[in-house]
Each structure stands twice: as structure tokens, then as C-alpha cells.
Amino acid sequence: MLTRKQHELLLFIDRHLKQTGFSPSFDEMKDALNLRSKSGIHRLISALEERDFLRRRHHRARALEVLRLPETMPAATGKPPLAESGPPPVTAPATDESAAAESFVPNVIKGDFANRLAGASVATEAGAIHLPFYGRIAAGQPIEALRETGAQIEVPMNLLGHGEHYALEVAGDSMIEAGILDGDTVIIRRGDVAQNGQIVVALIDDQEVTLKRLRRRGSTIALEPANARYEPRIVPSDRVRIQGQLVGLLRRY
């Protein structure tokens, strides 16, 4: 269980990332927690790293990544946690899941993306970058393996961290309780490894592709939907290849 200060700092960083797209400075964290020096922030961040709640992106300034949120609140101290005060977080679709360690809170960029392909502009103050757009991926039932189309999509740079990325369009409703809706465009960090509880693009038998939450169970992998209407799909681990992890989401309004 986290201490109150660790809990407050984690929620402050998470809220700041959702509102601004980048990590708070050490001065901002120090002031938010009413600490006298930055050394206290360094100790709290190190403790959160050791408990796998937070990760520093090395070689980048102000680069912190929240890996998960705590399942329980800190012990009562007569003072409410930091997250209960201050401005509300960026609006995201409601989810039936609690703020569990593995819950994904969509970093939603709203806008008119009707003409977003083939170099169409998605203007943001933070700038934008072109990513490969691989078309629709089933969030309800697996579909054929992805084929490169040559299409591209322009996305805000603040959705991206380190690594190589690509974009997919969601088809289906099996991830709605994680805030991922039919027609959303998801941003995927390319990679072949993932932690338990992460939402991933999984390739099954080199033929089917699906967007689900990953759960390892001995020699098998459970690909879990975020919709009570669907059952998890249990597959031997040697039949599943991870194609990337979900890092962001675009929604057309």
C-alpha cells in the first residue's frame, strides 16, 4: 500500500499528464505536495518506481509515465488525497472498471478526423507527426492479420512517447468499459512484449488480430474484453504474438 504522499504524487502526475500531455516539473510537484525541497520528490518518485507505479523515460526531460494506479486509497489521515481537490481531469468516457492497477484511462483527443487520412491535418499547439494507418481492427471479434495500406494519419505529438508507433481504427464494442468505442482510432506503440493487464494488439496463429487486455495464465494467455457481454479468449501462449501496446486514442466528433 502506498503512503499518502506517494498516492498524492502519483495522482497529481497522472492528472497533469492527461491535462497537458507532459509530466509536471519538480517545482510543480514540490508545490503541489507542499514539500520544502525537491529531494523529497526524488525519493517519492524512486519509491513509486520500485513499486512499479511509475517509470522514468531516460534521456528525456520531464518524462514520467504512470504504469498503473493503486487499487486502494491511502490510510486515513484526516486530509483528503490530492486528487479530490484542484481542477478536474481531462474528460474521458465513463468506465465501469475501478481505478485498478491495470485500468486504461484513454488519452482522448477530440476533433473532426473525417478527412484525417492521406496527410490530412490534425492541428495542435504541440505539433503533429505522421503515423502508418493500418485500417480497422476488431474490438469485438478477431479479424484477418493487418495488411499495410500505405495510408498515414497525422496525430498530436503529445500522444506519443518513446518508440515506434502506428494507428488502427477500432471496430466493435468489446472494449467499451475501458472507454474504447467503435470507430475510435487507437495509437499503438510497436513492441512484442507487454505486462499483465496492458491493452495490446495481439496476433493469433499469425492470422487473426484483436485489441484486448492481456493476462498470462501459466502456459496460456487470456485476451480479455472490457464488456460483460463477451467472454475472454484463452489461447496457448505459443500461438499469440504481441504486436504493440495501446498508448493513446483519437475520437471523431
From Swiss-Prot:
Keywords: Autocatalytic cleavage, DNA damage, DNA repair, DNA replication, DNA-binding, Hydrolase, Repressor, SOS response, Transcription, Transcription regulation
Active site: 174, 212
Biological process (GO), any one: proteolysis
Gene3D superfamilies per UniProt: Umud Fragment, subunit A (2.10.109.10), Winged helix-like DNA-binding domain superfamily/Winged helix DNA-binding domain (1.10.10.10)
Residue ranges of the annotated DNA-binding region, renumbered to this chain: 26-46
Single Gene Ontology MF annotation: DNA binding
Pfam families named in the record: LexA_DNA_bind, Peptidase_S24
EC annotation from Swiss-Prot or TrEMBL: 3.4.21.88
Site positions (Cleavage): 139-140
NCBIfam families (UniProt xref): lexA
HAMAP family: LexA
Name of the protein this chain belongs to: LexA repressor
Organism this protein belongs to: Gluconacetobacter diazotrophicus (strain ATCC 49037 / DSM 5601 / CCUG 37298 / CIP 103539 / LMG 7603 / PAl5)
Lineage: Bacteria, Pseudomonadati, Pseudomonadota, Alphaproteobacteria, Acetobacterales
